[in-house]
Amino acid sequence: TTLERNADIVHMATYAPLFAHVEGWQWRPDLIWFDNLRSVKSVSYYVQQMYAKNMGTNVVPATLATPTPKGEDGLFTSAVFDKNTGEYIVKVINTTDKAQTVNIKFDGLKKIEGNAATVTLDCSDYTLDNTLDHPNAIIPQDGWAAVEGNVIKTTVQGKNFVIFKVK
């Protein structure tokens, strides 16, 4: 989220290391794991993919109104507008283990009603990981959230990354 909010300064970023063989690796932040016949995308791969598919064209201000100092509650956010699709895209990450209530307000916009499309990456179950035998244990899931009076009132579960899209 910080990288996205500073897109006027940071023009490119890369993720390393990218690949790891399941029988010969040095550390575990790799994006793609493989053996001689198969490959599997890591949870980190899906985080990068979700950002890449929801870049938008303009960064817009986004703040979280919380009773604790910025970042101490484990919630992080960024927002963009995509002039090609007419969508506002808000990304929220909850790094804690507990669910947290989030109210996303779209101040200054025309009336938004209906539903926001969502994409959620749920990493709350520490026993799960994408493996060659279970490559889809943790993958992004599409959903929706109600928008009432230009506000999305929702709960973001612990260890979740959620993208909200409204027109």
Question: What are the residue ranges of the model-derived segments?
Answer:
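C-terminal beta-sandwich/jelly-roll accessory domains of carbohydrate-active enzymes
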Residues: 67-70, 94-167
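Short, well-ordered beta-strand segments enriched in hydrophobic/aromatic residues
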Residues: 86-95
